[in-house]
Design a protein with these regions (language model features):
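Membrane-interface "cap" regions at the ends of multi-pass membrane proteins
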Residues: 1-48, 54-59, 72-77, 86-89, ...
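Hydrophobic transmembrane alpha-helices that form the core helical bundles
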Residues: 53-54, 63-64, 73-161, 166-169, ...
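TM-loop-TM module centered on a large, flexible mid-protein loop between adjacent transmembrane helices
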Residues: 94-95, 101, 132-142, 213-245, ...
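Hydrophobic alpha-helical segments and their helix-loop junctions in multi-pass secondary transporters
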Residues: 129-136, 185-235, 301-307, 416-433, ...
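C-terminal membrane-solvent junction of multi-pass transporters and transport-like membrane proteins
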Residues: 149-152, 164, 371-382, 416-465, ...
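Membrane-interface loop-to-helix entry segments
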Residues: 152-216, 285-289, 408-418, 445, ...
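Hydrophobic alpha-helical segments of multi-pass membrane transport proteins
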Residues: 189-196, 351, 359, 408-435, ...
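A generic transmembrane alpha-helix motif of multi-pass inner-membrane proteins
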Residues: 201, 406-407, 411-412, 441-508
């Protein structure tokens, strides 16, 4: 079996011009930057950061964000180099297919489906939670949770997913415009939070900055990290007692808040819909990532300075709005709650786009049924977009948030690891390819990035790893029963095209 067969870059780019499976190029670097900010400034700023401070790192969650930001910022450069060479839908899946082979590409594609399916479901679920919270703060007697006997369903995720699915069916540019307007308003709310929050900061809340490590069972509200199955894998493997705070807490906090930095890899899935992608994709990814890191660092300082991490740990589900409520600024909590509702909505749209483009790329290659990659009159895979929207909505409506969120991180980190490893491989394999952006320090920096990403994976829970392995087993079953035998590369369906045709596919 030819498990490591690879596609050439020329084949990959030429496929973008296939009739009936062509995406429309209408996005600019600014659209990509806003897209990255839209998907990243949401759950991380408004919820995950406060939870990481409460149950993992205390005020040192600032360091957790810094570690996650540095690792992610380094990984973004790997994505930027690949995206400037291969501006095609599929992101890490496509990059891997041209470097280390089909079986690894399948693993990454399957992991990306996990990442974006779980992320889309988590965020749309959070959107419903915070919509109800906003209505409560405003004094409105309304609720999106419906009960039929012992059967419970939250209709809010279904509503928000249906709305953005409809927009994306009618064109990526339309969705990007709506998303952009909402994101600008969201950024304004974030900076409002930072400015107002500084007036409530107390230096005493930063002491101790790194709380001493202690058994998780002794910390009020930390039941989620006390069990064997919920402790970080490396603690389980080394026989350590489940603990929070201290250096282990900073590292596990970094693994948790990494969820906040997943935006740029979703942006890379839109390369095929970008004008002048060799230049605009690296620029859009870089600008977006810089904005994200700055905003997260500022909000982390304000959140931990306003309220003691111990007080946050006493809350069932601490968030940024919780911090303002605890200092008596209920009026600010209402504004923040509105910002959360608005902010999480934009995240849903970008994740729906990214998930669809991953499945689209795998379908076009034949690893998934080819019918999924057909595009309509608007230059979008309309039928696939509707199917993806339906699946995300159903998962969000019926599954618990806690089960889903860590799965996002492990899927993302596994993709980051392989993309980093692929950089030096592609440098040696195809030194002739033009690169609008080059990752500095290859091969050593990409290797260090891969190691750092894998270390963050080891800080995720044992249960997350078990679920991840089960997901991979299901993926291998699909690949060996269908994907391998229907892959266009294996069937000889892919043909090289003249360089003129390739240029037309890229720039047209």
């Amino acid at each position: 079996m030819q498990l490591f067969r690879t596609k050439s870059v020329e084949q990959t780019i030429a496929e973008t011009g296939e009739e009936g499976r062509k995406l429309k190029r209408n996005l600019t670097w600014w659209d990509l930057s806003i897209m990255g900010v839209a998907v990243a400034v949401g759950a991380g700023i408004f919820s995950v950061g406060a939870q990481a401070a409460a149950f993992h790192a205390g005020p040192a969650v600032i360091i957790s964000f810094l570690i996650a930001g540095i690792v992610c910022g380094a990984a973004v450069m790997c994505y930027a180099e690949f995206a400037s060479m291969i501006p095609v839908a599929g992101s890490a899946y496509t990059f891997t297919y041209t470097t280390v082979g089909e079986i690894m590409a399948w693993i990454i594609g399957w992991d990306l489906i996990l990442e974006m399916l779980m992320a889309g479901s988590v965020i749309s679920k959070y959107w419903g939670v915070y919509l109800n919270d906003f209505m409560r703060l405003m004094g409105w007697n309304a609720n999106t949770n419906l009960t039929f006997g012992s059967f419970h369903i939250d209709i809010a995720p279904i509503i928000i997913v249906a709305f953005f699915t409809t927009l994306l069916v009618f064109g990526t540019k339309i969705g990007a415009r709506v998303d952009g307007a909402m994101t600008v308003l969201k950024i304004a709310i974030v900076f409002f939070v930072v400015i107002v929050g500084f007036f409530y900061v107390k230096a005493s809340n930063f002491t101790p900055f790194i709380p001493p490590s202690q058994p998780a069972s002794t910390v009020e509200g930390s039941s989620a990290v006390t069990g064997v199955m919920t402790q970080p894998l490396w603690q389980f493997a080394t026989g350590m007692t489940p603990s929070v705070y201290g250096v282990p807490g900073i590292l596990s906090g970094a693994a948790l808040v990494f969820f906040a930095f997943i935006g740029f890899d979703v942006v890379a899935t839109a390369s095929e819909e970008t004008k002048n992608p060799h230049k605009n994709v690296p620029l859009g990814i870089g600008v977006g990532m810089l904005l994200i890191i700055v905003m997260y660092m500022l909000v982390a300082v304000v959140t931990t300075g306003m309220v003691s991490y111990a007080d946050l740990a006493k809350q069932d589900s601490p968030s940024l709005a919780t911090a303002f409520e605890l200092v008596g600024a209920d009026w600010a909590a209402k504004i923040i709650s509105f910002g959360i509702v608005l902010g999480l909505a934009t995240v849903v749209m970008v994740l729906l786009l990214g998930l669809t483009r991953i499945v689209f790329a795998m379908s076009r290659d034949g690893l998934l049924p080819r019918g999924l990659s057909k595009t309509g009159k608007h230059g979008t895979p309309a039928a696939l977009q509707i199917v993806v929207g339906a699946v995300v909505a159903l998962v969000a409506a019926f599954f618990d948030i806690g089960v889903l969120s860590d799965m996002v991180n492990i899927g993302t980190l596994s993709a980051f690891t392989l993309v980093a490893i692929s950089i030096p491989i592609m440098r040696k394999k195809r030194p002739d390819l033009p690169r609008a952006f080059k990752m500095p320090g290859s091969p050593w920096i990409p290797i260090l990035i891969a190691v750092a990403n894998f270390w963050l994976m080891l800080n995720l829970s044992v249960l997350t790893w078990i679920r991840f392995v089960v997901w991979l087993v299901v993926g291998f079953a699909i690949y060996f029963s269908y994907g391998y035998w229907h892959a266009r590369l294996g069937k000889g369906d892919l043909t090289e095209t003249l360089s003129a045709e390739t240029d037309k596919a890229v720039n047209g």
